[in-house]
Amino acid sequence: MAGPELLLDSNIRLWVVLPIVIITFFVGMIRHYVSILLQSDKKLTQEQVSDSQVLIRSRVLRENGKYIPKQSFLTRKYYFNNPEDGFFKKTKRKVVPPSPVTDPTMLTDMMKGNVTNVLPMILIGGWINMTFSGFVTTKVPFPLTLRFKPMLQQGIELLTLDASWVSSASWYFLNVFGLRSIYSLILGQDNAADQSRMMQEQMTGAAMAMPADTNKAFKTEWEALELTDHQWALDDVEEELMAKDLHFEGMFKKELQTSIF
């Protein structure tokens, strides 16, 4: 038999639930604009820009080569994939993985990430836990097992309380992870207000900071271009155009009426 249902005071909604939502939302908004002010443009070398443009040209050739004559397609393909002196064969780039010890820019970016992500979460989370501790704020609309009690009832140690109830501290963390759709609606898809996404990026920052291997990209593009054959897409375009009823007479009448009025 289920125990008696809890009845929360309406003042909890006004002085605990809504303030936590508003504070979390505006902290995310401030974090977004502070991140924009602190972000630094990544400088690319001339070699990196040139390599990226070459890969784009090869990809465009594979996708749209059917709209140019076969000889033009083979000439461009020969420039990239010539077995002896083709660009993808003769070009070898030296990949040097960056190190925070030798790269001050990478170290600065890591410090900026800590300032805009970790520090606000510690300060705001600690302040909310101190100010609104001990409150039961809301209840999820479905039953949960006892394994969810440590996650949803931080700061409340009641063994008899149903696991569906949410404490004030847990309500803050639910807002941190649950407001991402609101941030995307207001600030766009790629925003710095989503703290959960920034935490994931910070955890995988070392892997993301590793540069892409240009030699592997050249090899992959060489294989893809090598398998691409020329398929002339404009073979019967003249016959198809002449076979269509273009209705030029009606178009000329419409233009004449427009010019008169």
From Swiss-Prot:
Highest taxon of the lineage: Eukaryota
Ranges facing Lumenal side: 2-14, 131-168
Localization: Endoplasmic reticulum membrane
Residues in the Cytoplasmic compartment per record: 39-114, 188-261
GO MF annotation terms: membrane insertase activity
Regions that span the bilayer: 15-38, 115-130, 169-187
Family annotation (InterPro entries): EMC3, EMC3/TMCO1
One GO cellular component, as annotated: membrane
Disulfide bonds: none
Topology of the protein relative to the lipid bilayer: Multi-pass membrane protein
Gene Ontology biological process terms from the UniProt entry: protein insertion into ER membrane by stop-transfer membrane-anchor sequence; tail-anchored membrane protein insertion into ER membrane
Keywords: Endoplasmic reticulum, Membrane, Transmembrane, Transmembrane helix
Task performed by this protein: Part of the endoplasmic reticulum membrane protein complex (EMC) that enables the energy-independent insertion into endoplasmic reticulum membranes of newly synthesized membrane proteins. Preferentially accommodates proteins with transmembrane domains that are weakly hydrophobic or contain destabilizing features such as charged and aromatic residues. Involved in the cotranslational insertion of multi-pass membrane proteins in which stop-transfer membrane-anchor sequences become ER membrane spanning helices.
Summary of subunit composition and partner proteins: Component of the ER membrane protein complex (EMC).
UniProt family annotation: Belongs to the EMC3 family.
Name of the protein: ER membrane protein complex subunit 3
Source species: Bos taurus
